[in-house]
Amino acid sequence: MSKISRKSRLRKGKRGVQKGIIHIQAGFNNTIITVTDVRGQVILWSSAGACGFKGTRRSTPFAAQAAAENAVRASMDRGLKQAEVMISGPGPGRDTALRAIRRSGVTLSFVRDVTPMPHNGCRPPKKRRV
């Protein structure tokens, strides 16, 4: 009986998908783009840090644009044609990332802002004094 290596057993095959969801998580320090199928299974992801931006350059709109272009290009190689976009977070890269996705040629069915907003929940942390 041949022994199957642990890596090949754990690693799933590259999933091809035609319709997916693109999640944009725009924080103040980084922008993370995750592409999932309609069930929520992650197909691929990209971030400003993974695209080579380090330190304060990671939080720029240009870094978010590069991360979005990288993620959409890789997902189109896997067959993505139509997508929904979920944007979360108040970061500076949210609009630029969405603009990059719109330019890429993927058909967007809708764009939804899913940033969590408290209905007067927990007390926020005190303001910074610099």
From Swiss-Prot:
One of its GO terms (biological process) is translation. SUPFAM superfamilies: Translational machinery components. The keyword NAD does not apply. The keyword rRNA-binding applies. It is found in: Plastid, Chloroplast. It comes from the Eukaryota. Induction: By abscisic acid (ABA) during heterophyllous induction. Pfam families: Ribosomal_S11. Its main location: plastid. GO terms for cellular component: chloroplast; ribonucleoprotein complex; ribosome. Keywords: Chloroplast, Plastid, Ribonucleoprotein, Ribosomal protein, RNA-binding, rRNA-binding. HAMAP family: Ribosomal_uS11 (MF_01310). PANTHER family: 40S RIBOSOMAL PROTEIN S14/30S RIBOSOMAL PROTEIN S11 (PTHR11759). This is Small ribosomal subunit protein uS11c. The gene is rps11.
